[in-house]
Amino acid sequence: MTRATAIGLGSVSGVMAMALALATSCGGDEAPPQGGAGSIDGGSDGGARFDGSASLDASRAIDAASDARTDARAGDASVGNGRWVMGYYAGYERDAYPVAAIEWSGLTHLAVAFYLPRADGTLDESLFIDATSGPALARALVAAAHANGRKAIASIGGAGMHAQWVGATSSGTRAAFIGNLRKLVADYGYDGLDLDWEPVDPADAGAVLAFVQALRAAMPAATLTMPTGYINANAPDDLSLYSKLAPLLDQINLMTYGMAGAYTGWKSWHSSALHQQDPATPTSVESSVKAYLAAGVPAAKIGVGAGFYGLCYSPPVSAPMQALGASTIVADDGTMSFAHITTSYLTPQARHYDVAAAAPYLSFASATGPQGCGFVSYEDEQSLADKGAYVKAQGLGGAIVWTVNQGYLASAPLGARSPLLVALRKSVLE
């Protein structure tokens, strides 16, 4: 931060102002400071382009900002005892989780989602908000992360961006795209990039590897992470690409949530079962981890996923491992947030814990709640304790959260508003 300020990057004044405002906000449930994202000046047009003929001074500014972040990261090693919890903060869910309320004790990295690649190698920086408020939110998040000794990561892509990734990383646009990514990191003060290419089709493997190789060469000090899919044991994927990517990446995080559905041949199942799968319930965290390990990905590079949302099955299903009949998934990510589940569905009578799968669920005899659920699969403190114990026992790198916004209980007492992040702190980081 200090060296970046000295070289006069255009975005730093807003970042530093927010950092000062949030410097004492480490306990996420403390009273918020004055101001917030709305008080931070913008500084991006939401779609900046990188000029390949940019001046040497601009290039040096980018490099100097990278050096500054490298210096700052030297003090991060003790956070989490070498393990990580990276939480995704979705711009479109900003109202659900104020910046000043973030529970930093449960995080080592905050991934700001999403910057959208364009096929021509440029970026949409609006974060699903607009060209002014999106960048302002990003600057507030970066400042708050750094004020609390955590890393801020720019997440690129997301679901539905496959064609754009293919275009941006083609041989004719790759260099410009990497230039744009370097500029994004420098402009906002990010510590690195999360490369969310979904899906990675078999035909994409060569382009993905060439892109990540070039990106690592251009940004040797940056934190580079990549989320990847879970494994369906009935139809396992070729994971050989990830053993080649592992030396280039700091984290390979498995999106082991939302791993169930009303699919032909399936029974009802948990969103994120830790253990146990059979042909009718062919997903679990454990089976996905084993597949990536078998493909040659080092355990210390692997993170597992925790969804701060649930799945709602309609009746007649009322529990896991049941025949589906006419049941469907009627609500999931974005609607069935942990916050919504706790206020609209959770009761002591409805809650059960599947010890074999290490997963909680809610069971109802008839359609219940706003979505008419018969069976709700979700994460809670007990399942996250089991998941964290598994991470440690297997020597894995850590965990990711999709999304931290959905786990915030705004009406709970101070100190109890981010219980899932607190649970991950205890189980993964301590």
Where are these regions (language model features)?
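Ser/Thr-rich, Pro/Gly/Ala-heavy low-complexity intrinsically disordered linkers and tails
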Residues: 1-2, 6-12, 16-80
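Glycan-recognition patch characteristic of GH18 chitinases/ENGases
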Residues: 79-185, 318, 350, 416-429
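Structural recognition of alpha->loop->beta junctions
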Residues: 102-112, 169-197, 239-259
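Glycan-binding loop/region signatures in secreted carbohydrate-active enzymes
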Residues: 106-107, 126-127, 263, 301, ...
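A structural motif corresponding to the C-terminal end of an alpha-helix
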Residues: 140-152, 187-190, 218-222, 248, ...
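Active-site and adjacent substrate-binding regions of carbohydrate-active enzymes
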Residues: 173, 182, 186, 194-230, ...
